[in-house]
C-alpha cells in the first residue's frame, strides 16, 4: 500500500470516537443522595403529629355504610353545627347512627317521601295523582263518528309512552277494537284517560292473598345479584310491585274484563286460559301491524 493511501486512513481512524481512550470520555449522568425522613435541609418529611393522628383515626369505629341513594337532607341525619355533617365525620358525631333503609321499592326518598304526607284520599279519581292539588281533566270530544273514534283509539293504544302499556293496549286493540260497538268504544275512550301504570297493574295483577305485604318487595333475583353489586331496587325485574286495587268506577267494567282476559289468553305461564290451550300463550312480544277500519 502506498504512503498516499495510508496517511488518510490513519487520519480517519484518529478522528473516530472509538479511538478516544476511555479515560478521556465524560459521563453526563447525575445522581441525588436521598436523605432520611428526619434529615435534610427542609426538616422532616412527615409532621410530628402524624403518629398521634394515626392513632386517633384507627381507634375510632369505621364509618357507617352510606349508599349513594341515601340523602343527607333528612331530619334524622346527624348535624355538625347548622349544616349536615359529611359522611366521613359520622363516627365522630354519632357512632351509633345507622341510616334507615332508603328504599322499599319506591322512589319516594328522592321526591319528598321522607316528609310527613298529608291526608290522602282513599281512592283517586280520574285525572288525580298523589301529591298534586289540581286535577287533569281529559279532553272532551263531540261529533266524532265511529270510524274516526276507532282510528283515534288505535293510535292512543299504540302511543302510550312506556313499553309495557304500548304492548298491552296495542295487542288488545288489534283483537277487540274492530268488534266493539259505539258504547264500548266510549267506555274504552274513558279508560285510556287513566294513568298508564294503573292500567297496566289493573290488567296484570291478581288479588293478593291474606298476609301479602302491601308494599313493593325485592325479588329473589335482586337479592342474589343486585344487592351484592349495589344495584338500585327500582331496576326492572328487581322488585315486585304492590297490589293496586281496581277503583269502584272500573270494578264492573266490560273493557277491563276483556283486557284481563286478553292478558290471560296471551300469558305464557300461570293463567287458566293459557292452560286450557294445547300450547301456552304466545306473550306480548311485538306491536301488531296497523289496522284500517272501514266502518
UniProtKB/Swiss-Prot annotation:
Record-stated family: Belongs to the SDHAF2 family.
Q: Which UniProt keywords apply?
A: Chaperone, Mitochondrion
Organism of origin is: Aspergillus terreus (strain NIH 2624 / FGSC A1156)
Which portions of the sequence form the region Disordered? 35-90, 208-227, 269-295
Q: What does this protein do?
A: Plays an essential role in the assembly of succinate dehydrogenase (SDH), an enzyme complex (also referred to as respiratory complex II) that is a component of both the tricarboxylic acid (TCA) cycle and the mitochondrial electron transport chain, and which couples the oxidation of succinate to fumarate with the reduction of ubiquinone (coenzyme Q) to ubiquinol. Required for flavinylation (covalent attachment of FAD) of the flavoprotein subunit of the SDH catalytic dimer.
Q: Which SUPFAM superfamilies does the UniProt entry name for this protein?
A: YgfY-like
**Family matches, as HAMAP family:** SDHAF2 (MF_03057)
Instruction: Describe, as the record does, how this protein assembles with itself and its partners.
Output: Interacts with the flavoprotein subunit within the SDH catalytic dimer.
Which residue stretches does the UniProt record annotate as biased composition, category Polar residues? 45-75
GO terms for biological process, alphabetical: mitochondrial electron transport, succinate to ubiquinone; mitochondrial respiratory chain complex II assembly; protein-FAD linkage; tricarboxylic acid cycle
Which cell locations does it reside in? Answer: Mitochondrion matrix
Q: What are the coiled-coil residue ranges? A: none
Miscellaneous note, as given in the UniProt record, is: This protein may be expected to contain an N-terminal transit peptide but none has been predicted.
Under what name is this protein listed?
Succinate dehydrogenase assembly factor 2, mitochondrial
An annotated GO cellular component of this protein is: mitochondrial matrix
Q: Does the keyword RNA-binding apply?
A: no
Amino acid at each position: 500500500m502506498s504512503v498516499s493511501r495510508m496517511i488518510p486512513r490513519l487520519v480517519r481512524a484518529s478522528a473516530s470516537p472509538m479511538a478516544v481512550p476511555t479515560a478521556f470520555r465524560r459521563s453526563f449522568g447525575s445522581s441525588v443522595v436521598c436523605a432520611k425522613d428526619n434529615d435534610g435541609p427542609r426538616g422532616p418529611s412527615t409532621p410530628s403529629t402524624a403518629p398521634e393522628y394515626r392513632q386517633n383515626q384507627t381507634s375510632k369505629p369505621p364509618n357507617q355504610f352510606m349508599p349513594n341513594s341515601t340523602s343527607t337532607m333528612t331530619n334524622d341525619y346527624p348535624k355538625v353545627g347548622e349544616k349536615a355533617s359529611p359522611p366521613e365525620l359520622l363516627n365522630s358525631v354519632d357512632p351509633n347512627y345507622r341510616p334507615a333503609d332508603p328504599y322499599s321499592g319506591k322512589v319516594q326518598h328522592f321526591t319528598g317521601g321522607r316528609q310527613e304526607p298529608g291526608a290522602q284520599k282513599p281512592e283517586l279519581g280520574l285525572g288525580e295523582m298523589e301529591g298534586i292539588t289540581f286535577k287533569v281533566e281529559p279532553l272532551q270530544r263531540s261529533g266524532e263518528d265511529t270510524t274516526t273514534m276507532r282510528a283515534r283509539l288505535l293510535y292512543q293504544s299504540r302511543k302510550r309512552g312506556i313499553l309495557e302499556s304500548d304492548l298491552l293496549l296495542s295487542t288488545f286493540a288489534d283483537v277487540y277494537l274492530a268488534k266493539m260497538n259505539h258504547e264500548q268504544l266510549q267506555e274504552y275512550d274513558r279508560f285510556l284517560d287513566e294513568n298508564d301504570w294503573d292500567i297496566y297493574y289493573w290488567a296484570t295483577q291478581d288479588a293478593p292473598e291474606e298476609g301479602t305485604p302491601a308494599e313493593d318487595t325485592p325479588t329473589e333475583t335482586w337479592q342474589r345479584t343486585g344487592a351484592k353489586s349495589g344495584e338500585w331496587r327500582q331496576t326492572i325485574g328487581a322488585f315486585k310491585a304492590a297490589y293496586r286495587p281496581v277503583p269502584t268506577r272500573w270494578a264492573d267494567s266490560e273493557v277491563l274484563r276483556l283486557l284481563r282476559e286478553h292478558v290471560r289468553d296471551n300469558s305464557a305461564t300461570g293463567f287458566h286460559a293459557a292452560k286450557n290451550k294445547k300450547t301456552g300463550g304466545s306473550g306480548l312480544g311485538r306491536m301488531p301491524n296497523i289496522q284500517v277500519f272501514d266502518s
